[in-house]
Amino acid sequence: MFPLNFHYEDVLRQDLLLKLNYANVMEVPGLCEIRVVPKAPYNFIIKNGKLAMEIPCGQKFIQTQRGSTGKSFRSNPFLGSNKDKGYVSDLARQSTLRGHGMSNFLVRILTVMSLLDFPVEIRKNSIQFSMETEFCEFSPELEDHFEIFEHIRGFNVTIITSANTQDETLLLWSGFLQKDEGETQ
């Protein structure tokens, strides 16, 4: 288990239980997933996007098969498929992280955010921010592949939580940031 998971289970979850006055520990909000979308031109994403997203996210992409009926939401131009090039949304180019991959990526995000100042937008059940290419400078595994990232203008990151209100999301996010600050001091 990652230290961030221990922090959530042992410290943050109990703190939120008391602050939000919940009767049941299962009501306490947690992290569900992290969505990462590269800010790059469409033609770059087709050619190099798969590799550019695999390296920082730490997970291998798999090609999904399109169903036989009509347009499929699983048709993913980000993976280099030649299907349905008419409409491409950000959802078609995103990487979704859950479980250990999410925890590992969140540790990296918190480390970079403690060094740089990224504006964060906190909503009802999500935390959104844009990471510029400086993220690459703080990740040793990315420095070896800078030619892939030189055309990416950064990443849009959305952290989805199970919170019901913006205040719950804010408390959850500030708890993770305090954990990171506590380790660096």
Swiss-Prot record:
<keyword id="KW-0496">Mitochondrion</keyword>
<keyword id="KW-0689">Ribosomal protein</keyword>
<keyword id="KW-0687">Ribonucleoprotein</keyword>
<protein>
    <recommendedName>
        <fullName>Large ribosomal subunit protein uL5m</fullName>
    </recommendedName>
</protein>
<comment type="subunit">
    <text>Component of the mitochondrial ribosome large subunit.</text>
</comment>
<dbReference type="GO" id="GO:0003735">
    <property type="term" value="F:structural constituent of ribosome"/>
</dbReference>
<comment type="similarity">
    <text>Belongs to the universal ribosomal protein uL5 family.</text>
</comment>
<dbReference type="GO" id="GO:0022625">
    <property type="term" value="C:cytosolic large ribosomal subunit"/>
</dbReference>
<dbReference type="InterPro" id="IPR002132">
    <property type="entry name" value="Ribosomal_uL5"/>
</dbReference>
<dbReference type="GO" id="GO:0006412">
    <property type="term" value="P:translation"/>
</dbReference>
<dbReference type="GO" id="GO:0003723">
    <property type="term" value="F:RNA binding"/>
</dbReference>
<dbReference type="InterPro" id="IPR022803">
    <property type="entry name" value="Ribosomal_uL5_dom_sf"/>
</dbReference>
<dbReference type="GO" id="GO:0005739">
    <property type="term" value="C:mitochondrion"/>
</dbReference>
